[in-house]
């Protein structure tokens, strides 16, 4: 809900069968309707790649490349240059399952578009820039066997194996993902006896209301705020500012991590209908930047 409301990128960490893929596939249904300008840009990208389908007009694109995809498949290339999966997901969702299994070059290629919303391709004497303002939804197991921290099965991996597996994701890439959450597996009894959850339409309505607040205030989603605009639109209370500073110092966050948590806190405040970011909003945002080895 927070990711949909603010346009934030999301990393889900959990054992096999915990519902990560299902959550990602349902995510596009929580996003607000596409404005006509966004629909035209998305259609232009699809047309360049020969994938435009009139039946998909004004529907947010959802890309799900396999983890064997190369960096060129993700960012684009060729002569003349054609857009890759990240540009085809412009104004939509890019779902990367089994994130550490992607080639390192492909993962590092995500850093530029996650920061700027564009991707530059240079091939021989040609240079092309494509839009790539997508929402990254990534999923991964916490370790090679998948069951680190699971309540249902014991993990078979050594600490060294876990460290190597999680080390496939670089710090700069993780820095650019706003929300890091754990998706625990439920015992069969709890799963079968679980009460009905909220409907997609109810959650989508709340997300749309929060997104509308942000658009009226600053003209873009909270995740798209850059530089001084972040501080200008934050409206932190004194207690919230103090808590964020203490958390950033204690957890050793970079300036980028701190700003990304601040943007998440702004979205949480919007969902609560609050003009000011309070300490409770910051405390919740801090919880969503989990360190993988703590999972």
Predicted features and spans:
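P-loop NTPase catalytic core of nucleic-acid-dependent motor ATPases
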Residues: 1-8, 13
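Conserved alpha-helical scaffold flanking the Walker A/P-loop in AAA+ ATPase domains
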Residues: 1-2, 55-56, 60-61, 66-94, ...
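Walker A/P-loop
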Residues: 10-54, 116
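Walker B catalytic acidic pair
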Residues: 91, 97-98, 109
